[in-house]
């Protein structure tokens, strides 16, 4: 059962999902620390290239099915124009200032 984005527990993660689904690059980038990093399927990736390819140029969209770890871990159906839909897991490191310094995703 899908969790409505507005009901996600962690404010930074909620804003992340909202920005992805709205295809709002500026809002997305404002959620990240200047030195933010990410990994996909266990491999570190270039953040700028990855978000362009996997989210913004391919119309990425997240439907969250479950959250854990205080809202900083998600199980979601992620879809984009490149890969179609897949079950994915997401983990977030949120700093004291509320910005995301690291996120990881991969197939669930």
Regions found by a protein language model. Give the residues of each.
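Alpha-helix boundary/capping and short turn/kink residues
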Residues: 22-25, 41, 83
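Surface-exposed, charged secondary-structure patches
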Residues: 44, 48-96, 104
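Short histidine/acidic/glycine/proline-rich micro-motifs that form metal-
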Residues: 35-38, 79
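Hydrophobic pocket/interface hotspot
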Residues: 16, 27-29, 36, 47, ...
């Amino acid at each position: 059962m899908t969790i409505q984005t507005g009901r996600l527990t962690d404010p930074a993660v909620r804003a992340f999902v909202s920005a992805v689904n709205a295809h709002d690059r500026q809002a997305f980038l404002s959620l990240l620390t200047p030195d933010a990093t990410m990994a996909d399927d266990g491999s570190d990736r270039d953040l700028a290239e990855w978000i362009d390819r996997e989210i913004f140029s391919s119309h990425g969209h997240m439907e969250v099915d479950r959250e854990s770890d205080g809202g900083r871990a998600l199980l979601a159906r992620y879809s984009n124009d490149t890969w179609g839909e897949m079950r994915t897991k997401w983990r977030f490191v949120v700093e004291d200032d509320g910005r995301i310094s690291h996120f990881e995703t991969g197939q669930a």
